């Protein structure tokens, strides 16, 4: 069955949650001028049409297990995309050029993501998916500051060209190689439960920047830096003094 909303051209924000027996939802006709949508926990939703909702700025579509794809139209103002816990295996976001924050976590079969070249994306959350490589994704995100890609199938991760990265969660993959920008100061670096050997960990430690001593007077508390690398083959034999010398 379909959910019919009527004609609401003046609606700016739409929230629809926990609805059953609805397989298709077409927002193009009902609310073409909507700027924010929150579509969650539709147990039976298989098809969602938002191609003609050109004014969308925030897209939240989550916890719809039977929803395997979304066809995006031109959404030049959309800045945030929250689409976790769906059934996506592949997704193209090329028609959303203004995106800054992406959350596609817990799409358990998602293994392919297309982005525009040289986006302004600052945060990507794809933990709990099925990615074997995200090299092409990283190339499109020179402004990336936060990456969460834990619980995937990654064997290598190279962020050498992502100079703004400050938070990285890549634990519970199969990483044998992890590279970060030379001299980078990551406030959070969680790379435990991978396959990083002694040399890989030492190389990672060498790449990290020197933590500066806080000034005697400062208006805000000094930053804290956290790293977790246990449960790797090289965790016991790596040179922890490299890290100690940077503090």
Regions found by a protein language model. Give the residues of each.
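Surface-exposed alpha-helical segments enriched in charged/polar residues
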Residues: 206-209, 241
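Extracellular/luminal ectodomains of secreted and membrane glycoproteins with large N-terminal domains
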Residues: 200-201
